């Protein structure tokens, strides 16, 4: 086990005593890996607004790292703090004909977070009063945290009372429903599991981690686990965010395909796919 004083200590069931380690390395306080936050494009913001209206008050939220997760958080904060502006933005995107269920009002109960990765967007939501529904004293359960340097500093500066509202859990606890299932079902009410993909097919499959020529773009991470959870939890939904187009060698290409030679999420687990157009 390596001890690094630069790493903010976040408590929870994931903590374990020093006696469990065969060896403890101290004094090597290396700079932390601190990936910068990606710029949030207008396309990302449009997707974030579309998703923010799908999140019910009193529900549960999972998001991952990246600009779309930040855009979803920005949309939720706008909805909570300036619901009139949020309503107008959604109506403009939907040309005053919103499809599906829309949750447009500010949060009264607030949201509970359950996510493999604790990203800066969750801290933004906590500070804005959106992430406020507590279960056993915590408003967020997460497996690990990652972010830029200022994110780590915000965690270090956090008052103990606020830090106690973040419960670090084993990844296996957050990503799966089995184990203390009744406990998890009680916490993960009306869950919305939000993940990003590169492409989706008209049959419902999602491509997130690789290309059909075998090239690996990313790991699957917990995406499959959370999509599967959405089908196992009452009232839960899986939401896949995909930019409608990309720039290819021959110009603009659609990310909504009839079929594709690689699949991350199979078509039988299809649910909600959101682009900047709806």
Set out the residue ranges of the language-model regions.
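Conserved alpha/beta enzyme-core scaffold
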Residues: 1-277
């Amino acid at each position: 086990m390596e001890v690094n004083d630069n790493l903010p200590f976040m408590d929870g069931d994931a903590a374990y005593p020093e006696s469990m380690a065969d060896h403890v390395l101290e004094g090597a306080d290396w700079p932390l890996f601190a990936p910068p936050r990606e710029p949030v494009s207008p396309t990302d913001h449009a997707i974030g607004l579309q998703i923010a209206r799908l999140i019910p008050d009193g529900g549960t939220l999972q998001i991952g790292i990246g600009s779309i997760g930040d855009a979803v958080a920005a949309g939720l904060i706008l909805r909570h703090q300036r619901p009139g502006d949020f309503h107008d933005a959604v109506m403009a995107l939907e040309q005053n004909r919103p499809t599906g269920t829309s949750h447009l009002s500010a949060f009264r109960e607030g949201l509970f977070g359950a996510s493999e990765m604790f990203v800066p967007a969750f801290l933004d939501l906590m500070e804005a009063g959106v992430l406020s529904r507590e279960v056993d004293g915590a408003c967020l359960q997460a497996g690990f945290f990652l972010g830029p340097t200022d994110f780590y500093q915000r965690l270090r500066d956090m008052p103990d009372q606020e830090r106690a509202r973040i419960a670090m859990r084993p990844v296996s606890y957050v990503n799966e429903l089995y184990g203390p299932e009744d406990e998890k079902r009680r916490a993960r009410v009306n869950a919305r599991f939000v993940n990003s993909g590169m492409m989706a097919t008209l049959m419902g499959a999602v491509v997130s981690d690789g290309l059909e020529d075998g090239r690996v773009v990313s790991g699957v991470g917990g995406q499959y686990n959370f999509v599967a959870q959405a089908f196992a939890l009452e009232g839960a939904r899986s939401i896949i965010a995909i930019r409608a187009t990309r720039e290819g060698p021959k110009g603009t290409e659609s990310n909504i395909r009839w079929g594709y030679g690689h699949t991350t999420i199979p078509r039988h687990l299809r649910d909600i796919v959101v682009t900047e157009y709806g």
